[in-house]
Amino acid sequence: MGSRVSGPYMDSPPPPPPRPPSPPRHPPHPQGERHVGGEMLYQDTDHRLRALVGSAEGFGRHAIGGLYGAIHRVTSLQDDGPGSLREACRAEEPLWIVFEVSGTIHLHSYLRVSSYKTIDGRGQRVVLTGKGLRLKSCHHVIICNLVLEGGRGHDVDGIQVKPDSTNIWIDRCTLADYDDGLIDITRQSTDITVSRSFHSSFPCKSYYYI
């Protein structure tokens, strides 16, 4: 006669496996998530474009950039003015910035990027030269698929992140030949990812900076 074995699952079916933890919720921008009729604005026209946000990794993986903002198209390679990258980056509202032109933008001063911006260079070859990008006390910025090279002047970096900036993602960018450094992250800035980017180091004051 067979043995009887007692156990927690002998008289009833085993409990279902535990549910996986919910993914972290992206923090909303100050203006809210901008929904109309239960759907996110622009969802039907640029869903694949904005899917970039879901591929972020590392400490900056919660960066949402301009996810909940309008699509803004750069149509000019001028340093400033209508249709320029600088005009888009200084806007107060969240924006997902794309390019309708390829070429070189000669920056005569640092290009300051405000919070909740995505600079998305995919599909074009966009080169920034002369100066670099400055992220000062800003939050939720994504920079993707840009070339930054040939920055000249004292304290000129390809990308400066300071002070107290958070949730920044720099992805698939090429940086080379800046008089100071390529990417400078300082002064309590945190939650930042630099991924899949090419950095060509150049000497500065007997040291190398990346």
Task: Describe each region flagged by the PLM.
Residues 69-71, 156, 180:
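Short, solvent-exposed beta-strand edge segments and adjacent coil->beta transition regions
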Residues 78, 102-104, 124-125:
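Acidic glycine-/aspartate-rich tracts in secreted/extracellular proteins
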Residues 86-93, 104-118, 127-144, 150-164, ...:
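Extracellular beta-strand-rich solenoid/capping regions of secreted or surface-exposed proteins
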